[in-house]
From Swiss-Prot:
Quaternary structure, from the entry: Homodimer.
GO MF: amidinotransferase activity; glycine amidinotransferase activity
Compartment(s): Mitochondrion inner membrane
Record PTM Phosphoserine, positions in chain: 46, 49
Full protein name: Glycine amidinotransferase, mitochondrial
Recorded family membership: Belongs to the amidinotransferase family.
Description of what induces expression: Expression is induced by growth hormone and repressed by dietary intake of creatine.
UniProt KW keywords: Acetylation, Membrane, Mitochondrion, Mitochondrion inner membrane, Phosphoprotein, Transferase, Transit peptide
Tissue/organ expression: Highly expressed in the kidney and pancreas, especially in the proximal tubules of the kidney, and alpha cells of the pancreatic islets (at protein level). Moderately expressed in liver hepatocytes (at protein level). Expressed in the kidney, pancreas, liver, colon, ileum, jejunum, heart and skeletal muscle. In reproductive tissues, expressed in the testis, epididymis, ovary, oviduct and uterus. Expressed throughout the brain in neurons, astrocytes and oligodendrocytes. In 12.5 dpc embryos, it is expressed in the middle part of the somites, hepatic primordium and wall of the dorsal aorta.
EC number(s) reported in the record: 2.1.4.1
Main location per the UniProt record: mitochondrion
Catalytic activity: L-arginine + glycine = guanidinoacetate + L-ornithine; 4-aminobutanoate + L-arginine = 4-guanidinobutanoate + L-ornithine; beta-alanine + L-arginine = 3-guanidinopropanoate + L-ornithine; taurine + L-arginine = taurocyamine + L-ornithine
Length: 423
């Protein structure tokens, strides 16, 4: 990624001239060189004013509103999503590959319409209660702007309606003092970032770094139109080969396919995150952070945090139904691998966009406090045995929209420093 500031002067500016010139070709190298020289001269003549400007507009790191390096440091500020105006996505190939067959008639009938009104009302109430409890626990809560997701839109490559702003974890990732907007992979989520822009602009004005990953065209070439939807066996074989409904046509990823542990960040190739997307993130975060690809026995991977949820330094929840192929990496580092109990959510409860394993999709308020579903008594007891106090909140109707506490939130600021847990 090229930054404008690389041409302001100094050795980095000179390196940028050489690089940009080589990429553009000899005919434009002279123009780049002249631009660099004039910029360098202007920078030298106004060095004092630039220094004063930098001091005025760039707060010290301790003043930055965005700062989070892992999933468990003491939580100070969080973004919580909205269920209001949530719409059923059109039943396209990428949606079909990420949903259970028993719900396909629901999508075929309701695609482009609002989710059932009564259910949304209950979900809204649950999330409001979650926000109230977070506030009582001393956490600052931010909410995305309300948007009507039923509006149709069209790009040169596709047309769609929207989905929701319920799951900030899917679209936003905080790494240190930087907030990264993920490009997403569902066409119904193309404009989801708009709900968060007022929040992110405020963070930016107050000193946070703000990066938007390359936006995919989401043209037909991004999706395998012949992906074997019905055959679980075929999907297992393809998953083992690293092949999913999204192709490598262009980078795409959801932020929820990454999970942080200080300098080490773990990512999975999934139905919505491709290798190009992971590679973009790896290059962008290097050399301060190391991005590792891990995989699971899962024919339908989408988002890592209901499969592999890191809840403390050296402590991870690992889904017994989707074992991690690289689990020895964590065992050799001395980590404790905890297998969560089977969820107790009833079979007849609608889970239009997820599995029952949202029970392990928990939010850590710090190493000794966890927000957990009030109905999931077995996992509450598991946490208590680990010496972790549970903050019980009913979120079952909100689960139906595809996420648990971790999905419904994006931790913006945690009180802690960057550390390595694998050296």
């Amino acid at each position: 990624m090229l930054r404008v500031r690389c041409l302001r002067g100094g050795s980095r500016g000179a390196e940028a001239v050489h690089y940009i010139g080589s990429r553009l070709g000899g005919s434009l190298t002279g123009w780049v060189q002249r631009t660099f020289q004039s910029t360098q001269a202007a920078t030298a003549s106004s060095q004092n004013s630039c220094a004063a400007e930098d001091k005025a507009t760039h707060p010290l790191p301790k003043d930055c509103p965005v700062s989070s390096y892992n999933e468990w440091d003491p939580l100070e500020e969080v973004i919580v999503g909205r269920a209001e105006n949530a719409c059923v996505p059109p039943f396209t190939v990428e949606v079909k590959a990420n949903t259970y067959e028993k719900y396909w008639p629901f999508y075929q009938k309701n695609g482009g319409l609002y989710f059932p009104k009564d259910h949304l009302k209950k979900a809204v109430a649950e999330v409001e209660e979650m926000c109230n409890i977070l506030s009582m626990e001393g956490v600052t809560v931010k909410r995305p702007d309300p948007i009507d997701w039923s509006l149709k839109y069209k790009t040169p490559d596709f047309e769609s309606t929207g989905l929701y702003s319920a799951m900030p974890r899917d679209i936003l990732m905080v790494v240190g003092n930087e907030i990264i907007e993920a490009p997403m992979a569902w066409r119904s989520r193309f404009f989801e970032y708009r709900a968060y822009r007022s929040i992110i602009k405020d963070y930016f004005h107050r000193g946070a770094k703000w990066t938007t990953a390359p936006k995919p065209t989401m043209a037909d070439e991004l999706y395998d139109q012949d992906y074997p939807i019905h055959s679980v066996e075929d999907r297992h074989k393809l998953a083992a080969q690293g092949k999913f409904v999204t192709t490598e046509f262009e980078p795409c990823f959801d932020a929820a396919d990454f999970i942080r542990a200080g300098r080490d960040i773990f990512a999975q190739r999934s139905q919505v995150t491709n290798y190009l997307g992971i590679e973009w993130m790896r290059r962008h975060l290097a050399p301060d952070y190391r991005v590792h690809i891990i995989s699971f026995k899962d024919p339908n991977p989408m988002h890592i945090d209901a499969t592999f949820n890191i809840i403390g330094p050296g402590l991870v929840l690992s889904n017994p139904d989707r074992p991690c192929h690289q689990i020895d990496l964590f065992k050799k580092a001395g980590w404790t691998i905890v297998t969560p109990p089977t969820p107790v959510i009833p079979d007849d409860h609608p889970l239009w966009m997820s599995s029952k394993w949202l029970s392990m999709n928990v939010l850590m308020l710090d190493e000794k406090r966890v927000m957990v579903d009030a109905n999931e008594v077995p996992i509450q007891k598991m946490f208590e045995k680990l010496g972790i106090s549970t903050i019980k909140v009913n979120i079952r109707n909100a689960n139906s929209l595809g996420g648990g506490f971790h999905c419904w939130t994006c931790d913006v600021r945690r009180r802690g420093t960057l550390q390595s847990y694998f050296d």
